[in-house]
A protein has these predicted regions:
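Small-residue-biased structural context
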Residues: 1-189
């Protein structure tokens, strides 16, 4: 036989455990929902090359917002740079782990290596811009230099290399690249 005090202790412990489990489930579901929302524009864009082009356009819109800032908008620059870094990092992860790997498998190794090499410079620009004082008069010119690299990289992919890869792949292989790329993007979304 238990005392009233033991019943209260047992019920309190059970209530806390149930509350903790419910909180964990809600947190996990919220994270999955957030990931789905971040990856949805890519999924809805269509095939892998169209999805990557849509991500390119989204990144350029963030560049546009950054270029409209002045040297006094340091908090806004920091926030937008963080958004840009997240968007491009997820994008690069998809390209490097699926698209560039498929390019190598399809005889486009030199081009894939070149694109991957450029991603190293993208990381360098992010480092430099993050380290610079956001009010520094040299910050915006550095951002514009970065945008020039990004736009050149995007044009090379969209106008030349991605069409070459798409043409080398069967419909089934293109479908597989789309699915694999979305899976990789979901990991970082």
């Amino acid at each position: 036989m238990t005392t009233g005090r033991e019943d209260i202790t047992n019920n309190t412990g059970r209530t806390v455990a149930i509350g903790a489990a419910a909180g964990l489930v809600v947190g996990l579901l919220a994270n999955l929902t957030r990931k789905a929302a971040v990856q949805a524009p890519t999924l809805l864009a269509g095939q892998w090359d169209e999805a990557l082009a849509a991500e390119h356009a989204a990144a350029l819109k963030i560049f546009d917002l950054l270029e409209k800032t002045d040297n006094h908008a340091t908090a806004r620059r920091s926030f937008l740079l963080m958004q840009l870094k997240h968007a491009i990092s997820k994008h690069a992860f998809q390209e490097e782990n699926v698209v560039y790997a498929m390019m190598r498998d399809q005889g486009l190794a030199e081009a894939a290596d070149h694109l991957n090499h450029e991603h190293g410079y993208v990381k360098q620009y992010f480092f430099d811009l993050t380290e610079m004082d956001k009010g520094d008069p040299a910050w915006l010119p550095k951002l514009r230099e970065f945008r020039g690299l990004i736009e050149s990289h995007m044009r090379e992919e969209e106008d030349d290399l991605f069409p070459k890869l798409r043409a080398k792949l069967s419909a089934e292989q293109n479908k597989h690249v789309t699915a694999a790329m979305s899976k990789e993007g979901f990991k970082l979304a």
